[in-house]
């Protein structure tokens, strides 16, 4: 039977809901960052300039006199194009959201196969759910605030939070080559044992 998530995972803001669509991570981050930088309560939590199914989007905001340029991209081919533009100096961003799946998690491999029309409906569903939440901004989730206070160094961006909430990756090809060799050796041994177990009626191993 369906059950509610254990706390603190059962409590979320609209910012957590819209994470499932392209632009959602960016919008949730802006809801936090704009209020943090300006020092003023955010009156309008909707950042519609980062919404939509275009696979590359950009927007510029004025935050307390600072020009902030953000980018949103989904699909790794599109992400490479945008990365190349950034490397060449053609584009410059303060923050870029990248999602691999078309339209974001709403079309991820764990979802039923979909079409562009259904993606639009799924996206609209998340934004509608966002509106029904009592809280829309991530910083209004008191349970997240409690987690940071108790386990992550007191605030987002702290050294302790960075260490605990981020991971790193390194090339493991050498390890997989060793594993392949072990498997190949084991397969060869199995074949030899299988060959030795085949005998004729006199108990001789066929030549």
What spans do the regions from the language model cover?
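Iron-sulfur (Fe-S) cluster-binding modules
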Residues: 1-207
